[in-house]
Amino acid sequence: MTYWLCITTQENWEIIKEKNVWGVPERHKNAISRVKPGDLLLIYVKQRGVGKEIEGPKVVAVYEAVSEVFRDSSRIFKSPPEMGNEAFPLRVRLRPVKIFEEPVDFKKLIPDLKFIENKRKWTGHLMGKAMREIPEEDFKLITSSSK
């Protein structure tokens, strides 16, 4: 079993929840092609501005992959402006394992996460990625921090 951190926006998190599917752009095919049924995916929602406030990055749920990767170009995901008009065609079906009542504050965990080697420039471990494999130890730390 492999553990994944899947990086998304608040808008696309709502779609994941509604449709039980994870999708990525074509350029991330190498990462998603390694996802197998039974793998566990943590959904990480990026920091965003809400009015004058900043809502920090958070982990909101755990899902299990229940399909192999498949291609579907229907436009269910919202592409951020910097990505143009991508459809996120590479997808995997999901089964919810746990949707956290209160999202996990990701920044509080950074000092203890093994996959983040540079704690000061931690965003570099996530920028430009749709998803990344994480160690089981980090998966357990994140999920044990949830309610």
Swiss-Prot record:
CDD domains: EVE-like. InterPro entries: EVE_domain, PUA-like_sf, UPF0310. Pfam families: EVE. Coiled coil: none annotated. Belongs to the UPF0310 family. HAMAP family: UPF0310. This is UPF0310 protein Kcr_0474. The lineage of its organism: Archaea, Thermoproteota, Candidatus Korarchaeia, Candidatus Korarchaeales, Candidatus Korarchaeaceae.
